């Protein structure tokens, strides 16, 4: 049964009707504001933006892997934005430096030959994409930068080259690969020399032999084009 209306004394001579029912109902009602928006909607928008950015990063990594000869991780913890900008300016045009979360890079390389890079997926990594066969020339700028800035802690965390994983302790093998000029000299020297020299070239590691053959084919193409 609804409570009856009555008046409360006030400092003025006027009195106003007061309903217990309306009072108790209103006391349990949260105030509304015309500009109030549910938080869940904002969270949904932020989540969608975050998901889109992650998808874009994965796609960027996949694009960088096209025509990529070597992919290396660099521990970047502690590096400043200024240092990153300086490092990027010292890299050759065929080498790209990208900062991306390990989980996103792992998603991009899943099911590919680059999946061998899994041991690198620890800590904070920047990723070096080398789009050139001149591997030593691509790695040297960072080594120089590392020594100049005394960044011993920010070393290569690993790399994948021709489907094989190279740990930090194996980078010497990558940094001492023969350059194209050296391959030309080696090939020409073996062809002009005794048969034993040619045999020695053929018996070289498969990786070096492939590079020698590629260089020789390229040389023949260049000579054919100049005629």
UniProtKB/Swiss-Prot annotation:
Gene encoding this polypeptide?
RPL10
A molecular function annotated in GO for this UniProt entry is:
rRNA binding
Assembly, in brief, is: Part of the 50S ribosomal subunit.
- UniProtKB keywords: Chloroplast, Plastid, Ribonucleoprotein, Ribosomal protein, RNA-binding, rRNA-binding, Transit peptide
Chloroplast as a keyword? yes
What is the protein named? Large ribosomal subunit protein uL10c
Chloroplast is among the record's keywords: yes
What does the entry list under GO cellular component? chloroplast; ribonucleoprotein complex; ribosome
The record's family statement is: Belongs to the universal ribosomal protein uL10 family.
Task: Report the subcellular localization.
Answer: Plastid, Chloroplast
What lineage is this protein's organism placed in?
Eukaryota, Viridiplantae, Streptophyta, Embryophyta, Tracheophyta
What function is annotated for this protein? Answer: This protein binds directly to 23S ribosomal RNA.
Range of the transit peptide: 1-47
């Amino acid at each position: 049964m609804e409570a009856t209306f009555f008046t409360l004394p006030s400092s003025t001579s006027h009195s106003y009707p007061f309903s217990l029912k309306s009072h108790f109902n209103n006391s349990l009602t949260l105030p509304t504001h015309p500009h109030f928006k549910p938080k869940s909607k904002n969270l949904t928008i932020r989540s969608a933006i975050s998901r889109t950015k992650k998808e874009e990063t994965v796609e960027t990594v996949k694009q960088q892997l096209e025509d990529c000869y070597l992919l290396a991780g660099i521990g970047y913890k502690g590096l400043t934005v200024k240092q990153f900008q300086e490092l990027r300016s010292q890299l050759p045009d065929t080498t790209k430096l990208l900062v991306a979360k390990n989980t996103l890079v792992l998603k991009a390389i899943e099911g590919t030959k680059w999946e061998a890079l899994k041991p690198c997926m620890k800590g904070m990594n920047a990723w070096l994409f080398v789009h050139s066969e001149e591997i030593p020339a691509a790695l040297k700028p960072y080594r120089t930068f590392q020594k100049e800035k005394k960044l011993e802690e920010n070393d290569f965390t690993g790399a994948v080259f021709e489907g094989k994983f190279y740990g930090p302790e194996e980078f010497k093998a990558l940094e001492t690969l023969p350059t194209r000029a050296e391959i030309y000299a080696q090939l020409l020297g073996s062809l002009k020399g005794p048969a034993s020299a040619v045999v020695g070239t053929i018996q070289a590691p498969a990786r070096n032999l492939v590079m020698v053959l590629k260089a020789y084919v390229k040389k023949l193409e260049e000579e054919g084009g100049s005629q």
